[in-house]
């Protein structure tokens, strides 16, 4: 068997998921909607609203709608595959069964890229809201900003130390075996939503409809600004959508709850579409309130736009409360993605594509300490020296690749195994799966050329590792060797 045709059997992947290993079915659609909203609402709305508005103007509202629609298609595909293969590994595992080992490696490497960069991006977003706290503690601006930031004296920042600190702090907690409880998570979700409601209510009295004209000053399609070089950031509604896509991460938390859902055929659809619709509505309302209260070209220059707008409106104390809500709640997003990163490494190492030492679990804490700390270090380095925009765009490239693979996996398995029982079926899959793939491809095209190049370079490194190690050492390769 050629390495191109190595595939995992679905029955092998799901073997053992029964009896004592089956989760209790306790969730209904309200739980799933709450789970999705809690996982999705995070750095995107607190920080990327401003950056997106700088690219699209008031049209950023449309950018949120487009990004949400593409993610909804991908989410429905995730739901079908997660019930078909209720095992760790997410898109990597689905691709291994549907399209084979090389594609699975590509997807797994994309997920590693995505999760590490998401941790870094959220750390930078957290830093922007914690800036004043660190400044009050005596930290100089030089240590509160990365090299890309121009300081008041004309110089540049040295390192974003708060981002480095939060990255390593969360990694340390995970390495010790700390788990966030459901109760704490629900409280923090409530804190995030209440802060956004307060923001919208305070913006309504000063809402100015003239701020929405022109609605799309940079046009709809992603394009380079006039006179800009090929590596410059693209502008337009689609350019903002390709960045704002970051704001919808986390919906897969709903699809992974399939095994615990009482009526998955009905409730998963409601949970996924409901949470995506709720978050898209929340994002569009917050974006509209922001633009109504302050012109896009003004607040887009701030790394903490919601706080900036409230300060501009002379709501200093409320601005501090919104910033505090972000400081308290955003680390849970970092924790969730660092936890997920360790699971991707674990499954790939278990499959032999990476050294098995990487999946070693500490006997005392029950966590893969080495990989957790390595993820923390990588996140700290990236967040300490790069801008939120650059990190988020590169993270989006990895996620888009994974979403494309998930859509393709649904199509391949529907055609190859049409009669296999499915607990949840993607509605209108011949339309939804291709729509998700095409939407992701267009969003990838809308990313800056520099981001696309970095994504290619990262995968060239990954391809070398696969050829030198994974292709020969994988469990399937060893099985082939033993059988020959």
Label each region the model flagged:
Residues 50-61, 111, 122-129, 138, ...:
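Transmembrane helix-loop boundary segments of multi-pass membrane transporters
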Residues 127, 158-212, 216, 272-276, ...:
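Membrane-interface loop-to-helix entry segments
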Residues 155-159, 357-369, 403-452, 472-483:
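C-terminal membrane-solvent junction of multi-pass transporters and transport-like membrane proteins
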């Amino acid at each position: 068997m050629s390495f191109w045709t190595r595939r995992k059997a679905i029955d092998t992947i799901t073997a053992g998921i029964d009896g004592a290993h089956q989760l209790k079915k306790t969730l209904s659609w309200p739980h799933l909607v709450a789970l999705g909203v809690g996982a999705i609402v995070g750095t995107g709305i607190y920080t990327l609203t401003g950056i997106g508005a700088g690219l699209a103007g008031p049209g950023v509202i449309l950018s949120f709608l487009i990004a949400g629609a593409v993610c909804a298609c991908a989410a429905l595909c995730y739901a079908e595959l997660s019930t078909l293969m209720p095992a760790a590994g997410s898109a990597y595992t689905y691709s291994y069964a549907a399209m084979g080992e090389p594609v699975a490696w590509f997807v797994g490497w994309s997920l590693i890229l995505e999760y590490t960069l998401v941790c870094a991006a959220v750390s930078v977003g957290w830093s922007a809201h914690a800036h004043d706290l660190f400044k009050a503690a005596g930290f100089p601006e030089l240590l509160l900003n990365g090299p890309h930031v121009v300081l008041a004296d004309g110089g540049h920042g040295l390192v974003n130390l708060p981002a480095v600190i939060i990255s390593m702090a969360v990694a340390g907690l995970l390495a010790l075996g700390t788990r966030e409880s459901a109760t704490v998570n629900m409280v923090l979700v409530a804190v995030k939503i209440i802060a956004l409601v307060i923001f919208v209510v305070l913006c309504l009295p000063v809402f100015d409809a003239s701020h929405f004209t022109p609605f799309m000053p940079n046009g709809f399609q992603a394009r380079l600004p006039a006179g800009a070089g090929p590596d410059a950031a693209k502008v337009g509604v689609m350019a903002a959508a390709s960045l704002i896509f970051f704001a919808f991460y986390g919906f897969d938390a709903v699809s992974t709850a399939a095994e615990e859902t009482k009526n998955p055929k009905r409730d998963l659809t409601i949970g996924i579409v409901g949470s995506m619709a709720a978050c898209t509505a929340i994002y569009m309302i917050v974006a509209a309130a922001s633009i109504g209260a302050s012109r896009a070209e003004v607040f887009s220059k701030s790394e903490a736009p919601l706080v900036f707008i409230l300060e501009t409106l002379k709501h200093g104390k409320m601005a501090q409360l919104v910033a505090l809500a972000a400081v308290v709640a955003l680390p849970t997003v970092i924790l969730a993605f660092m936890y997920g990163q360790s699971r991707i490494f674990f499954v790939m190492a278990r499959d032999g594509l990476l050294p098995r030492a990487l999946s070693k679990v500490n006997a005392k804490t029950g966590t893969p300490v080495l990989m957790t700390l390595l993820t923390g270090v990588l996140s700290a380095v990236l967040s300490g020296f790069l801008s939120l925009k650059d990190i988020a765009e590169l993270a989006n490239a990895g996620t888009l690749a994974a979403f494309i693979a998930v859509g393709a996996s649904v199509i391949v398995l529907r055609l190859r195994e049409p009669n296999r029982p499915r607990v949840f079926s993607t509605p209108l899959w011949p339309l939804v799966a291709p729509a998700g793939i095409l939407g992701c491809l267009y969003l990838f095209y809308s990313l800056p050329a520099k981001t696309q190049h970095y994504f290619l370079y990262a995968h060239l490194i990954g391809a070398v590792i696969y050829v030198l190690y994974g292709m020969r050492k994988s469990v399937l390769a060893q099985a082939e060797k033993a059988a020959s």
